[in-house]
Amino acid sequence: MAPANTLSAWSDLQSHHSKVGKTFVLKDAFKSDPERFSKFARTFTLPADISSDSPNATDILFDFSKNLVTEETLDKLVRLAEEAGVEKKRDAMFAGEKINFTEDRAVYHVALRNVSNQEMKVDGVDVMNTKGGVNEVLQHMKEFSEQVRSGEWKGYTGKKLTNIINIGIGGSDLGPVMVTEALKHYGAKDMTLRFVSNVDGTHIAEALAASDPETTLFLIASKTFTTAETITNANTAKSWFLEKTGGQGDITKHFVALSTNEAEVTKFGIDAKNMFGFESWVGGRYSVWSAIGLSVALYVGYENFHKFLAGAHAMDNHFRTAPLKENIPVLGGILSVWYSNFYNAQTHLIAPFDQYLHRFPAYLQQLSMESNGKSITSDGSAAKYTTGPIVFGEPCTNAQHSFFQLVHQGTKLIPADFILAAKSHNPISNNLHQKMLASNYLAQAEALMVGKTAEEVRAEGNVPEHLVPHKVFLGNRPTTSILVGGHIGPAELGALIVYYEHLTFTEGAIWDINSFDQWGVELGKVLAKKILKEIDEPGAGSGHDASTGGLLGAFKKYADF
């Protein structure tokens, strides 16, 4: 496809922004159009059979009305998506075509949550029902998770395994961490879950210090089983286990692999029957739906894991079939492009008003920034426009007492997403906490929109004139409010994640970049291997710049290995 800035819709949007966007005032738009909310809000409904509030369905309301757009703006943004081939690229992904063009791979994580079991093929092979395919792996996960949870699968001394340590990094860590935290309400009360990702020895040391080898199960999550950080931590865990058990511990009962490299897995000592595989068309940041989600199934139970997949599948179907103007992830994506490329916004705030979602911004950070942190378009030329935004966030109301100052009164435009569930899993104090949370969720979006003028500050009385400008809020700051109509359960969480997945897809499709590779993580890893050897050799290494050489020498001096 053509670079985004060569499309006629792009030029049209530039003119439109100059004429309308620069002078658009949100609060005036609401005053002039009482129907603005209904015109710009969209509702996604989860079926009752997977809803956390079954037998009732769950609505998820996406309010786009507090964004800096008119109906004309939205039409022009939809036309940009059409010209950029978003629908064609979407259909190619769902058809198993190799849209990851730099690695010649399909992008088929949607198959992992294909709970309706529609036929899905890559290179003519049905990935759902082939040997080692999606359904076989899911069945293996179901059987294993139920055996561990029931106590049928025991440790080497016959005790139930209640301490789960997942060792992985990147997508093999961020997804499971986020999901198990988000679904903590559904977690097994007799189970402790720990995640080790960092090669910093502190991470594995602290996890092991709090563990009993007789009741600990290790999940080693690495597709290739060669990821440096993961295998280093896995070997440390193995040594600890054998030392603590006096060499009597049975590795096959306490270690399983989420991997496809049988040779390395069995060499490590894990029984090949305890391998849970996934294909090359599963990118790391999309792998929580795969065998990498085994920790989720163990913690919340396979039935809830299946609902998690089903909620994701429901949003997949919406994205695949809804017209662009009614397509909720597409709307989120084109709004992101609008702010990034026409308002020069560099960041995007994710603020969940839900403590269980405290790792959601970090998860979305990887999803967005690893996908769209690219500067080269499909023809190999440099993009002549901004691509992926910097995604950040923290749960509210905590965030209101840290960086919200900058969001309200800083010099940068920061589009924000606010997320709230109407019902709390912990409705304590007669729902007082939930009411306070909701009031802040509503108030922050309103405050960012309406602001406060100098006249309004003066009208409050007793404000010295020299303080008036400091108490002014410019307002006109855009937000998208997402309201889950019930609790955030497995299906609701699945749908929310997939909303952001396909929003990210839409951005990348418009920017004409490959959202599915991650070459940017490679260079540092290559250099680290060289430097690791040099740390054990005399001198300050070779071939480095003066700064790196100087730092290496200083480190070796101070570390005194």
UniProtKB/Swiss-Prot annotation:
One of its GO terms (biological process) is glucose 6-phosphate metabolic process. This is Glucose-6-phosphate isomerase. It is found in: Cytoplasm, Cytosol. Homodimer. It comes from Neurospora crassa (strain ATCC 24698 / 74-OR23-1A / CBS 708.71 / DSM 1257 / FGSC 987). HAMAP family: G6P_isomerase. One of its GO terms (molecular function) is glucose-6-phosphate isomerase activity. NCBIfam families: PRK00179.1. It catalyses: alpha-D-glucose 6-phosphate = beta-D-fructose 6-phosphate. SUPFAM superfamilies: SIS domain (SSF53697). It is an enzyme of class 5 (isomerase). InterPro entries: G6P_Isomerase, G6P_Isomerase_C, Phosphoglucose_isomerase_CS, SIS_dom_sf, SIS_PGI_1, SIS_PGI_2. GO terms for cellular component: cytosol; mitochondrion. The active site is at E370, H401, K525. Keywords: Cytoplasm, Gluconeogenesis, Glycolysis, Isomerase. In the cytoplasm, catalyzes the conversion of glucose-6-phosphate to fructose-6-phosphate, the second step in glycolysis, and the reverse reaction during gluconeogenesis. It holds the Pfam family PGI.
